[in-house]
Amino acid sequence: MTVTRSQTGKTPKKLERPGYVETPGRRVTRSRVVVASETSADDVSDSATEIRGRSKSTTRRRQVKTEEASEGEEKGRANGHINGNTNGHTNGHTNGHTNGHTNGHTNGSTKKPRVIDGWVEGSDPKIDYSGEFEFGGSWGVLSMMIGFPLLMYYMWIGAVYYDGKFPRPSEGQSMSEFLAHMGHLVCEGAYPSLRAWIIYWVFFIFEALCYVLLPGVTVMGRALPHLGGKQLPYYCSGVWSFYTSIALAGVLHFTGIFKLYTIIDEFGPLLSVAIISGFLVSFVAYFSALARGAQHRMTGYHIYDFFMGAELNPRMFGILDFKMFFEVRLPWFILFFISLGAAARQYEVYGYVSGEVGFLLMAHFLYANACCKGEECIVSTWDMYYEKWGFMLIFWNLAGVPLSYCHCTIYLASHDPATYRWNRVFLVFLYAAYLFVYWVWDTTNSQKNRFRQQERGTMVSRKTFPQLPWQTLKNPKTITAADGSKILVDGWYGKARKIHYTCDLYFALNWGLITGFSSPFPWFYPIFFACMITHRALRDIQRCRNKYGEAWVEYERQVPYLFIPVSYSSS
């Protein structure tokens, strides 16, 4: 599956070339360079990269702003008045005056600077001029930094000590006694032991080495306006990293050096290590950026800036991009290995792997594999281009995604298979339906991606597994907008406008459904994701209407269905 965005049109045409992954045995010395597509409003969300479900109920993916700076106001606003600027004034200008002109007026012959993603052309990129705060500002992000780790511990306690039920005070137990008891359970069962630290960080370092040393392809990122259109190279070795990790994990398990079910046995301590690591790495990332003067779009509010991040493109050795590294290898690899560990534990205890655990193992493998085989498409996403490397990205990838989305697996691993056994006919149906929806999901995003690549002359064919039928449309039907951009009205996007969201939600619901309804915690991810994806779909629709105008109205007329051909349609 590939997931790309449209480009600006500045990329020169080039011939389609077959993709490759180099064989192991030597360090890659030459990697194909592919120019990443620019993001367009109609494909702002990618299944393999955006479904990561970060805690963004009010997601930050704002459309690139090209409106003019407002009468001397934008240039001095800087989100809380940084560097001694007061009352919204900058560079010594007062009362909203810009460039020496009074009352905020500019010379009619002088072109006003554009505001691009919080940066005013020609201004200091270290300052955020957008005037916008997400998640309720400093108080909101502080609540999230405190609340989500507590929620993770609460769900873990419920899963382990309350048989998957909500922990609540027992009869006659005061709230203070209940909270003290909860704290005792965390100290007793989730103490960050040395063994847990070694497991977590050996995996972390190993994956970093795989990122740098294994074969892959190099992809050029989107142009960065504040750097004069400079494009950064991104090295994509996810496919080799994933399969190398699986092979080594198998060797360690079968030789007895490290049994895979150790991940299940040590889940509590690993949870604490991941949470602590999320905070530690966030502190190092923030203060090292300040010390090196590498901060970008800062508001001057330290709690908020710590959460959103200080540095835009943190790198090591010129090849290891930390945002790229954290995006796939840590969250989705860990989630897959937790499911693999559950299967190993079940086989150790019962002598077989239940169909329900096998279902989750299949689902998590397909998802992690999809992220890897389309890794070159991540470089054009909003996370890589706009989001800074702060607590939001760091904590969510180190702890939030792998250790809160896994409760479906934890529930199955903690209970006898007889307690959640589905009817065998229904289970076969779940497998078949899931694989069908995966095909729709994969080919939907592939059609969108390859349409954009063909349009810009950057089509690259990679023979990564799995290659599925109907991934590429020949002479697809399109609608041309007034600005010359095209809307794909063919293939799956000729049937429903957000059909890839339908698939995403189907996956999430199945992860909960396979566990049954005895515990609420496996349903945390499906419910959270359903709320997020609904909000995102409505937001995307509005952005597309603004971008494409009458062309989008025509698209809605030709394709009236939003999610599936019988679903709600916006009008």
Curated annotation (Swiss-Prot):
It comes from the Eukaryota. GO terms for biological process: ergosterol biosynthetic process. It is a multi-pass membrane protein. One of its GO terms (molecular function) is Delta24(24-1) sterol reductase activity. Residues 64-77 have a biased composition (Basic and acidic residues). GO terms for cellular component: endoplasmic reticulum membrane. Induction: Expression is induced in the absence of erg4A. Residues 1-116 are annotated as: Disordered. Keywords: Endoplasmic reticulum, Glycoprotein, Lipid biosynthesis, Lipid metabolism, Membrane, NADP, Oxidoreductase, Steroid biosynthesis, Steroid metabolism, Sterol biosynthesis, Sterol metabolism, Transmembrane, Transmembrane helix. The chain crosses the membrane at residues 140-160, 197-217, 238-258, 267-287, 324-344, 348-368, 390-410, 425-445, 513-533. NADP(+) binds at K448, R452, L488, H500, Y501, D540, C544, R545, N546, K547, Y548, Y555. Inhibition of erg4A and erg4B might be an effective approach for alleviating A.fumigatus infection. Pathway: Steroid metabolism; ergosterol biosynthesis. It holds the Pfam family ERG4_ERG24. It is found in: Endoplasmic reticulum membrane. Delta(24(24(1)))-sterol reductase; part of the third module of ergosterol biosynthesis pathway that includes the late steps of the pathway. Catalyzes the last step of ergosterol biosynthesis by converting ergosta-5,7,22,24(28)-tetraen-3beta-ol into ergosterol. The third module or late pathway involves the ergosterol synthesis itself through consecutive reactions that mainly occur in the endoplasmic reticulum (ER) membrane. Firstly, the squalene synthase erg9 catalyzes the condensation of 2 farnesyl pyrophosphate moieties to form squalene, which is the precursor of all steroids. In Aspergillus, the biosynthesis pathway of the sterol precursors leading to the prevalent sterol ergosterol differs from yeast. The ring system of lanosterol in S.cerevisiae is firstly demethylised in three enzymatic steps leading to the intermediate zymosterol and secondly a methyl group is added to zymosterol by the sterol 24-C-methyltransferase to form fecosterol. In Aspergillus, lanosterol is firstly transmethylated by the sterol 24-C-methyltransferase leading to the intermediate eburicol and secondly demethylated in three steps to form fecosterol. This is Delta(24(24(1)))-sterol reductase erg4B. It comes from Aspergillus fumigatus (strain ATCC MYA-4609 / CBS 101355 / FGSC A1100 / Af293). The lineage of its organism: Eukaryota, Fungi, Dikarya, Ascomycota, Pezizomycotina.
